[in-house]
C-alpha cells in the first residue's frame, strides 16, 4: 500500500542481539527534501473525510494527534488534556478515557504518548517515568507494566508483548532511542543523527510499523 509519511531511519533489528551502546544494526535512509515530487498521487491513494459522532461523551477540543489502526478499523484521538477518544472506522463513538484518569490502581495519572498495541489488542499509554498502561478500545485495563529508564521517556512503540522502543527528550540525552525488554528490565541505547526540530516534540509522531519493518523519524 502507498503511504504518506517520510521515512528517515529504519529500525530493523531486535533487542536480543544489541550491545549496551548500540552503534550498528540501524539502516539510515537519506531524504532529499529539496527535490520533492508535486504529484501527491505517487504516495496517496485517496483522501477521505470521516465525520466523528458528536454526543455528550465525545465532545473534544485541542487534540494532539489522531491515529487510525487499519487492523481494528478504529480511530483514536489524543487531546491536550491527555484524554483519549476512540471511534469506529465509520465515525461511531466507542468510548473515552476520562473515567480512567486518576490515582487508582487501574487508572493513569499522566499519559504523554499513546499508541495502538496490536499484540495486546489495545492502546498503550505512556507515563514519562516508565509505566505503560494498556487499555482496551473501551478503556478497560488490560496490562500495567513498568520499566526503569535512566531518564524520562516521551514516545513508544511495541516490538512485541515484551519489547519496546522509546525516545528520550533532547533535554536529557544527545539523540538516543532506548530498546527495552520489560521482562528482563534491560535497556539498550542507540544514537541517531538528524533531529528535525527543537522544543516540545510531544505532539510529533516518531514511530511507525509498516509490514514487518519499524520506522523512526527523529522529532
Can you say where each PLM-predicted feature lies in the sequence?
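Beta-strand-rich domains and repeat architectures in extracellular enzymes and scaffolds
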Residues: 48-81
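Short beta-strand elements that form the blades of beta-propeller/WD-repeat-like
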Residues: 30-32, 73-79, 121-127, 162-172, ...
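Blade-loop segments of beta-propeller domains
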Residues: 53-58, 92-122, 127
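Short loop/turn segments that connect beta-strands within beta-propeller blades
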Residues: 88-90, 136-140, 181-185
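Blade/loop signatures of beta-propeller domains
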Residues: 18-52
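Repeated scaffold domains used in trafficking and secretory/extracellular systems
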Residues: 62-65, 108-115, 150-159, 199-206
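Short coil/turn segments at the loop-to-beta-strand junctions that recur within blades
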Residues: 56, 98-106, 147-153, 192-198
Amino acid at each position: 500500500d502507498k503511504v504518506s509519511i517520510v521515512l528517515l531511519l529504519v529500525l530493523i533489528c531486535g533487542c536480543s542481539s544489541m550491545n549496551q551502546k548500540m552503534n550498528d544494526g540501524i539502516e539510515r535512509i537519506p531524504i532529499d527534501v529539496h527535490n520533492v515530487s508535486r504529484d501527491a498521487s505517487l504516495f496517496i491513494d485517496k483522501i477521505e473525510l470521516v465525520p466523528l459522532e458528536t454526543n455528550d461523551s465525545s465532545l473534544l477540543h485541542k487534540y494532539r494527534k489522531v491515529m487510525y489502526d487499519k487492523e481494528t478499523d478504529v480511530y483514536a484521538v489524543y487531546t491536550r488534556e491527555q484524554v483519549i477518544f476512540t471511534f469506529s472506522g465509520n465515525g461511531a463513538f466507542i468510548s473515552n478515557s476520562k473515567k480512567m484518569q486518576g490515582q487508582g490502581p487501574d487508572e493513569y495519572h499522566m499519559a504523554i504518548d499513546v499508541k495502538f498495541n496490536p499484540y495486546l489488542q489495545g492502546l498503550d499509554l505512556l507515563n514519562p517515568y516508565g509505566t505503560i498502561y494498556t487499555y482496551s478500545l473501551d478503556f478497560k485495563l488490560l496490562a500495567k507494566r513498568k520499566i526503569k529508564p535512566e531518564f524520562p521517556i516521551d514516545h513508544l512503540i511495541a516490538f512485541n508483548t515484551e519489547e519496546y522502543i522509546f525516545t528520550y527528550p533532547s533535554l536529557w540525552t544527545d539523540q538516543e532511542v532506548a530498546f527495552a525488554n520489560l521482562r528482563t528490565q534491560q535497556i539498550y541505547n542507540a544514537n541517531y543523527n538528524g533531529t528535525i526540530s527543537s522544543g516540545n516534540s510531544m505532539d510529533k509522531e516518531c514511530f511507525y510499523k509498516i509490514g514487518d519493518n519499524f520506522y523512526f523519524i527523529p522529532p
